[in-house]
C-alpha cells in the first residue's frame, strides 16, 4: 500500500489510482498497489489516526517499507508498522501564485 499526505497524493498514489487530496486536507490517503480486486478503493484518514499496517503470511516474496523512494527496510511475516502524521510541519517554497490544481492539470496534460 501507499500512504501519502496531500503533497504525496499527486505522485505515486495518484499513479496507483488514488485520489488527489486538497493541499489543505489534514490527513492521509492509503492507496492499494496493484490490488487483485477492483473493489479495493483508496481510503482517506484524519490526521489524528494511527494506522497499523500488518504484514500477513508471506510466501517467497519480501515486504519492504520505504519513505519517498529511499532504501527499504525489510518486514517479516506478522510484523506491524505504525504510521501517523508528525506534529512537525514542512514549509514549501513556491514562486508566483500557488495553485495546486492548476499545477496538477499541467502535469497531467504534459503526459498525454
Predicted regions and their residues:
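Single, functionally critical "micro-switch" positions that shape active/binding sites
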Residues: 7
Amino acid at each position: 500500500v501507499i500512504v501519502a499526505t496531500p503533497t504525496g497524493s499527486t505522485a505515486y498514489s495518484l499513479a496507483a489510482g488514488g485520489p488527489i487530496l486538497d493541499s489543505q486536507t489534514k490527513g492521509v490517503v492509503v492507496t492499494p498497489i496493484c490490488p487483485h480486486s477492483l473493489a479495493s478503493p483508496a481510503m482517506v484518514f484524519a490526521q489524528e489516526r494511527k494506522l497499523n499496517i500488518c504484514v500477513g503470511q508471506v510466501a517467497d516474496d519480501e515486504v519492504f517499507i520505504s519513505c519517498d523512494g529511499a532504501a527499504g527496510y525489510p518486514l517479516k511475516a506478522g510484523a506491524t508498522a505504525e504510521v501517523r502524521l508528525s506534529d512537525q510541519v514542512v514549509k514549501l517554497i513556491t514562486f508566483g501564485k500557488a495553485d495546486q490544481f492548476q499545477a496538477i492539470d499541467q502535469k497531467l496534460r504534459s503526459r498525454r
